[in-house]
Amino acid sequence: MAKLIAFALVASLCLSMVLCNPLPEEVQEEGLVRQKRVTCDVLSFEAKGIAVNHSACALHCIALRKKGGSCQNGVCVCRN
């Protein structure tokens, strides 16, 4: 009985995956959207006296192998 239930579960999962796939003419390829202001808008906050404002931007720029960076008008600008 347990094998029958397991088989029915696997079969229903496979069937649902096949039915949920979009048709080839329905597939829409959209470009990747980059949010350039995330490090300066979302991550600029202060909690218990600790401000993250320009630190998140500087870390982002260092990860891009730049010398650092800061927020200017809500946009992270990296130094060369």
UniProtKB/Swiss-Prot annotation:
Residues 1-20 form the signal peptide. The keyword Signal applies. Its main location: secreted. Potent broad-spectrum antibacterial peptide against both Gram-positive (B.subtilis, S.epidermidis, and S.aureus) and Gram-negative bacteria (E.coli, S.typhimurium, and P.aeruginosa). Is also active against all antibiotic-resistant bacterial strains tested. Induces apoptosis in C.albicans, but does not disrupt the fungal plasma membrane at all. Acts by permeabilizing the bacterial cell membrane, but not human membranes. Also shows potent anti-inflammatory activities, since it reduces both LPS-induced nitric oxide release and pro-inflammatory cytokine production. Residues 21-37 form a propeptide. Belongs to the invertebrate defensin family. Type 1 subfamily. One of its GO terms (biological process) is humoral immune response. This is Defensin coprisin. Keywords: Antibiotic, Antimicrobial, Cleavage on pair of basic residues, Defensin, Disulfide bond, Fungicide, Immunity, Innate immunity, Membrane, Pharmaceutical, Secreted, Signal, Target cell membrane, Target membrane. The nonamer peptide CopA3 exhibits potent antibacterial activities (MIC=4-8 ug/mL) against both E.coli and S.aureus. This peptide (LLCIALRKK-NH2) is shorter than the mature peptide, amidated and with a Leu at position 60 instead of a His residue. GO terms for cellular component: extracellular space; membrane; other organism cell membrane. It holds the Pfam family Defensin_2. InterPro entries: Defensin_insect (IPR017982), Defensin_invertebrate/fungal (IPR001542), Scorpion_toxin-like (IPR003614), Scorpion_toxin-like_sf (IPR036574). It is found in: Secreted; Target cell membrane. Has the structural arrangement of an alpha-helix connected to antiparallel beta-sheets by disulfide bonds (CS-alpha/beta). The alpha-helix is amphipathic.
